[in-house]
């Protein structure tokens, strides 16, 4: 089994999309606990649970698209969409989280590393298969 087979964009899109979709469902179901986990128990206001639930709901649509792309697209189109998903995830989620949450005591460093790493692997899988093999 070579690297190209392991880095199949279909599996990466469906796998990452499904995992993050599941995590988003938990965020919608228990926004209060998500807020406590992210902001700290002594730093959670009444409205923070709703913010976390809406953030998770918003992310559900993004990660559902990852799954749909992985299932429906093929060949070169799948590789291109995988690279585009990787780039947009890196820019908006990783850079956005670093810039927007840096001063607010929101500890997102581990989340940034996980999302950044997964996004980078997603981009590599698309690049390795860019010829549509």
For each feature predicted by the language model, list its residue ranges.
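Juxtamembrane helix-break-helix junctions at the cytosolic face
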Residues: 9, 65-87
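Hydrophobic transmembrane helix segments
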Residues: 18-58
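Membrane-helix boundary connector in multi-pass membrane proteins
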Residues: 92-112, 128-131
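Hydrophobic alpha-helical transmembrane segments of polytopic
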Residues: 9-19, 55-58, 84-88, 111, ...
